[in-house]
């Protein structure tokens, strides 16, 4: 597993992750809900990328376009999910098991800060990338500290899981959680790369939709995890990017876009239970409005697919003839992108 992670742990992916949140979403190393102004800037910037940036990510996009790479990512996802499924029963009998599971991640995130400073992983970073990696550590450290509820019980859980893992899996428990931590971000970064950058770099071409099935598959696999675990693994903004492939994939059966509706509803419910009203309705991060807007777009995609069986605004790019009903829809909805 370490070998797989090291193969993926190139700093292009980390750069994608942070470039996207810093420059596109206008949220510098923060999982906060974007403001109205941020959204307006995002819609503007998504159409006006600096030529140097487009060129840079275009090369990266082409390099990443190979089946071997996709297969490795797929194996990584499967490993992460199977590991969760095996580990959870060990401490699932406790009433506050999910909180302790989160606390364990907090503990390992804290360990990661020390590992990065002394471990060989840090030594391979070029001088020009050190600030980026420090921001990576800073972002996730602050993220976990903010979103997890701490208890003093993690030591007991840690030793119990450690013994179980090393006896049954024959691998280092420390390495396992270090790997799992990066699994999450590698997967999310790939979803952003294939789902979002493809649409910007290959705008108005068939290529922009080339990886919709791939990103949809990645998101489906992550949704196999318990929704209560996803609360700890992904902030609402990150979760939104997991839902976008479900919106984008043209599925006549409506099963895929329905997953976006269902998963968003479940995530919001668990998020509200975990953080109570103080966080959910706070003025600084009004997650109530955030989930409302995400659900609105989920429903919008669902309604369009249920009505036409496809997205009419892709017809011209895909070389498809539009029906009279579709032409009417396209004419009457100039501000709706789907």
Predicted features along the sequence, with ranges:
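Intrinsically disordered, low-complexity activation-like regions
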Residues: 2-338
